[in-house]
Amino acid sequence: TNNSNRGNNSAQPVDAANPRNYSDPEGGKGNVNGHIIRFKEENTASESFEWDIYLFGAEASMDANINLSGLNDNNDLSSPDGMWFDPRGVLWIQTDDGAYTDVTNCMMLAALPGQVGDGGVVTTSNGQATIAGAKVTDE
């Protein structure tokens, strides 16, 4: 989900797992639109894991260094909140948006989860590098 305090004070600095601190057109600051982290363990006995940021929430019109998942008017979102995998492996994402209110973007989305590492390194508007999943498509 979002974290409007991220990067706005020393208690919640930006880092690779929480990389964004930006201002949105409505005056919000921090990690206003949120993101989803994806984890991968080698097996059930693993004591470590790999990860990337599967999806960055953002308004379609935001700069590419904020809209890091390449969302467009057909799929932009904010504040991913609830998630559930169905038996087919489809990821259902519920949004609970209080940040992006000039359009109706409280919704339930269906997504194919892909694989950790299917994207690459991205750099946010505040200069923080992180690992992101593949860019979103309309397909």
Predicted regions, residues:
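Sequence/structural signature of beta-propeller domains
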Residues: T1-E139
